[in-house]
Amino acid sequence: MPGGRRRVGSMNIAGFWILAQFVLLLVANVKSSADSELCGPRGARGPPGLSGLPGPPGYTGPIGMPGLTGRPGLPGLVEKCPPLPQSAFSVKLSGPFPGPSQPIVFQEVLYNHQGHFDPATGVFNCSVPGVYHFGFDIELFQSAVKVGLMRNGIQIRDKRAEAGDSHEQASGSSVLELEKGDRVWLESKLDREESEKGTTHAVFYGFLLNGN
């Protein structure tokens, strides 16, 4: 019968397929056993290979945290500065000036701590070489004056003033560079008779600006 033949054919094909799968599995097991029998024992470790080439530089990492504050350093050496040289004076006169061409001798010493001004002669003697400032201030009433600022007998500057029935002022100053032993003074340029008229008050002073 045709239907019976189809079922027999299908059963034959299925049986063949199962038989083929069994054969393949058997062959695989045999091959695996043969490979296992061919492998020998593990050999010794070989020498290390050559180093590989260096890789490219990596990316820059983030900035690290600030470090701890270091210990304070040792204190520095303390040195004493030498004292600066000093030289100054201030003197005052109330009354007539002496005759001409001689130093004016002042009656009152306002300042002369270094002793560089000689009150007896009216002369400043330079003991500290350097740059000095000298000046004078004169107040007049019914009188006339003419004075010269002198250095070693040479006039540096002069000043003339007259006053009637009112008070007048006359002043002058100069900056001089002196060497040790130089002498500075203020002297009158009028005769004594002219100087004795009226009332005169004068202050003469000087001080060191910068020592050499």
UniProtKB/Swiss-Prot annotation:
Glycans are attached at N125. Residues 1-34 form the signal peptide. The lineage of its organism: Eukaryota, Metazoa, Chordata, Craniata, Vertebrata. InterPro entries: C1q_dom (IPR001073), Collagen (IPR008160), Collagen/C1q_domain (IPR050392), Tumour_necrosis_fac-like_dom (IPR008983). This is Protein HP-25 homolog 1. Residues 40-76 form the Collagen-like domain. Keywords: Collagen, Glycoprotein, Secreted, Signal. GO terms for cellular component: collagen trimer; extracellular region.
